UniProtKB/Swiss-Prot annotation:
<dbReference type="InterPro" id="IPR011332">
    <property type="entry name" value="Ribosomal_zn-bd"/>
</dbReference>
<dbReference type="Pfam" id="PF01783">
    <property type="entry name" value="Ribosomal_L32p"/>
</dbReference>
<dbReference type="InterPro" id="IPR002677">
    <property type="entry name" value="Ribosomal_bL32"/>
</dbReference>
<dbReference type="GO" id="GO:0006412">
    <property type="term" value="P:translation"/>
</dbReference>
<keyword id="KW-0687">Ribonucleoprotein</keyword>
<protein>
    <recommendedName>
        <fullName>Large ribosomal subunit protein bL32</fullName>
    </recommendedName>
</protein>
<keyword id="KW-0689">Ribosomal protein</keyword>
<dbReference type="GO" id="GO:0015934">
    <property type="term" value="C:large ribosomal subunit"/>
</dbReference>
<comment type="similarity">
    <text>Belongs to the bacterial ribosomal protein bL32 family.</text>
</comment>
<dbReference type="GO" id="GO:0003735">
    <property type="term" value="F:structural constituent of ribosome"/>
</dbReference>
Length: 48
């Protein structure tokens, strides 16, 4: 099992974690004009 040779400083760890943010799904406009999430099936029209 790997063991770190030295402690990672708070600043260095924080710099590494800057890209850990949550990406929100952006809704897209469907053909019928309603908003939906991409890659999800529409309940009413059954379109992908």
């Amino acid at each position: 099992m790997a063991v770190p040779d030295r402690r990672v400083s708070k600043t260095r760890a924080a710099k590494r974690r800057t890209h850990y943010s949550v990406k929100l799904a952006k809704p897209v406009k469907a053909k019928d004009g309603t908003w939906k999430l991409p890659h999800h099936i529409n309940k009413f029209t059954k379109e992908y």
